[in-house]
Regions:
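Generic helix N-cap/helix-start motif at coil->alpha-helix transitions
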Residues: 11-15, 44-49
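His/Glu-based metal-binding/catalytic segments typifying zinc-dependent metallopeptidases
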Residues: 1
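Non-catalytic C-terminal accessory modules of carbohydrate-active enzymes
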Residues: 6-10, 21-25, 34-41, 51-137
Length: 137
């Protein structure tokens, strides 16, 4: 998780990989044919970001989990709407990564499972509310 902080964390969320692929490579696959900083090739894919929040909580680093939460939270990007270009209440499928000229621009609102994963990670790991069959742990 230290490498996530060092290489992948951005003000808009955590990128999938860095640097982006810039040359097609059939041995690696389709990801190398996607524009750098877009979708699977170096973008900030919203869906797995909440997994990093949970991981940081498990490691006892709640402040870092909150930092990552705040970076992806749509509401916290209201002051950057000219860059974001998406609704301030919607998680988007991805946000353009550092290797794209439109870095920070959000795309495909509502086309993601990020809302569910965000709720799961925030309630169970950040808040510590863990339902069991008979009770809350």
């Amino acid at each position: 998780m230290d490498s996530v902080k060092e290489y992948l964390a951005t003000p808009y969320g955590i990128m999938l990989n860095a640097p982006s692929y810039t040359v097609p490579d059939d041995d690696i696959g389709f990801i190398t044919r996607v524009y750098p900083g877009v979708k699977e090739n170096g973008a900030i894919f919203s869906h797995p970001n909440p997994w990093a929040w949970a991981a940081e909580c498990v490691l006892g680093r709640g402040n870092r989990a909150m930092e990552y939460y705040n970076s992806l939270c749509p509401y916290n990007q209201n002051d950057m709407i000219e860059i974001r270009e998406a609704e301030p209440y919607s998680y988007c499928q991805f946000i353009m990564g550092k290797d794209h000229t439109a870095y920070g621009r959000a795309r495909h609102p509502f086309k993601t499972g990020s809302g569910g994963w965000s709720y799961f990670s925030a309630t169970r790991y950040m808040f510590g509310i863990r339902p069991d069959f008979d009770e809350l742990d």
